[in-house]
Amino acid sequence: SMMGVFSGMEIAVWDILGKALNQPVYNLIGGQFHDRLRTYTYLYPKNSGDEGNLKNKGDDVYHDGDAAAERALDYIEMGFTAVKQDPTGPYSFQGGRELSLHELARSEYSVKRIREAVGDRADILFGTHGQMTTSSAIRLAKRLEPYDPLWFEEPCPPDQIQAIGKVASATTIPVAAGERLTTKQEFHECLKAGISILQPDIGRSGGIWETKKIFVLSELFNAQVAPHIYCGPIAHAAAAHVAFSSPSFLILETIQTEFHDNLLTRSLTWDHGYMLAPTEPGLGIELNVETILNHPYSSGGRLHLEMCNTPLDSNNQKKITEL
């Protein structure tokens, strides 16, 4: 929580500094390296709310591989060249569990169907949110290897860096991690463990300057960085500026909802799967104060990565709504 507060304040200072100097932030941290940024999206149901929640019994892209494949094609039509899915849920607070054969088969089938649908037009990113033991993660990775995912994300709990490193050494799929980590020191441990794709969330990792250091550190290990985004348009813009200035950038997560759009009166430009470099000073965005005031903070809604309180046994076949 403290790093989240610090990161937000630090990002605000960079926005102020850029506007004072009439320069986009990326010019203040090394200059522009990329002309545009490749982006990816999660597979969200067609009939979903702003948080990605399933509504009105729409297609369940999280557990139905056929629905996931169909939705992946929709995103390709939008211009995306990479899609992410996490079919290993539901999530439990306990973490580090052994997936059942049913869950292993469901995950493999989903990736298989997506690959059959998209062919070589899009990369598949496989998320797990740290839900597996080391052995279970390796078992799943072996089943996914034939479908050539771009990465296998956070296969073990984030505080088990050495365990994630063991998974990385046991599979041909690049292993990614870092959305819940802070500061360059923790990411250095990831790199030493053999994790080849770092995923700092700039709203948690320490802000713009600390995240820039994480990018630079990745170059020493011949690794790449794919910023994690789930904090809204300010974090999205801040991460984009660091990425535009960094050679080791791989791909940027993006979330496109009507609510996110309404939070801004000026936003960054997204064009057919790519984020274009802003030319306006600071972060290049302006907040819609009226919209923000009309949506005060509330702790009553669904949180990203909300865990169920029911421990899951090794033969779990239930969905989160059934627990």
What are these regions (language model features)?
Residues Y40-Y42, K84-D86, L125-H129, E153-P155, ...:
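A cross-family glycoside hydrolase active-site/sugar-binding cleft signature
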Residues K142, D148, C156-G282, E286:
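Shared catalytic-loop signature of beta/alpha-barrel
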Residues D35, N47, M132, P155-P158, ...:
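Residue-level signal for alpha-helical context at structural boundaries
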Residues A82, W151, I197:
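Short, Asp-centered acidic motifs that coordinate Mg2+ and/or phosphate
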Residues S1-L125, Q131, S135-I138, K142-P146, ...:
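N-terminal capping/lid subdomain adjacent to the active-site entrance of alpha/beta enzymes
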